[in-house]
A protein has these predicted regions:
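Structural preference for long, well-ordered alpha-helical segments in enzyme cores
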Residues: 36-39, 67-72
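A short acidic (Asp/Glu
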Residues: 62-68, 92-94
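Conserved short loop/turn motifs at secondary-structure junctions
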Residues: 55-60, 89
Length: 211
């Protein structure tokens, strides 16, 4: 049927992508944007290259893109990021809860070094106003020391950068030291990763929960 055919196409695409040079692709869901992100980077000139690209915000935060982010931060001269919340579908005609990232990447010497973050903007008016405000420019070391995965936060207000730098003085939540309490983050039940725990039959066996 149509579902079986789609499954075969998806599986074939996944197998093709796994043969490519896309570090981190195996972590988490096999999303196409991870492969495209690396292709943009590999195709740009390491001397005078510039990249302007629209990506899902997960490219800035998900574990599967951590190697890509570290590569950008360590090798790019400048990285400017603007995030857009698709409230009311003002950016794209798609899911309004999505956050989109606009990345400006420069590999040219002489460009402003570091990483700037603006947004998330929830409307055209807030975007036009906010893009004129000078954003704090983080050094690469400041960002890499925020967390283990080089994830980039959302900074809803201009002063949020100062708050973030203050929070940075505290240990990571993942700190694991003897004789000290430890916080461990965990994700929700995942339809892909926890699929073996789910029963898709029509009846609900004893001891199971209907979802």
């Amino acid at each position: 049927g149509e579902w079986e055919q789609l499954s075969k196409v998806t599986e074939s695409l996944a197998n093709i992508l796994k043969t490519g040079k896309f570090p981190g692709l195996e972590v988490g869901d096999l999303d196409l944007y991870k492969a495209f992100a690396w292709r943009f980077w590999f195709l740009s000139s390491p001397i005078m290259g510039r990249i302007g690209v629209v990506m899902p915000r997960s490219a800035l935060a998900a574990a599967g893109s951590a190697k890509f982010r570290r590569e950008l931060m360590n090798e790019a001269e400048g990285l400017d990021i603007v995030t857009l919340q698709n409230t009311g579908k003002w950016v794209f005609d798609m899911e309004p809860r999505y956050t989109i990232a606009l990345l400006g990447i420069s590999r040219s010497a002489g460009e402003p070094k570091g990483i700037s973050l603006k947004g998330p903007f929830t409307s055209m008016a807030s975007f036009l106003e906010g893009k004129e405000i000078d954003a704090h420019r983080f050094s690469v070391d400041e960002v890499l020391n925020l967390n283990e995965s080089a994830s980039l936060p959302l900074l809803p207000e201009p002063y949020s950068a100062e708050v973030l730098l203050q929070l940075r003085k505290a240990p990571w939540l993942s700190l694991d030291e003897p004789d000290s309490w430890r916080a461990r983050a965990d994700s929700e039940l995942h339809a892909t990763a926890q699929k073996p725990l789910m029963d898709f039959s029509g009846t609900c066996p004893d001891g199971f929960w209907k979802v």
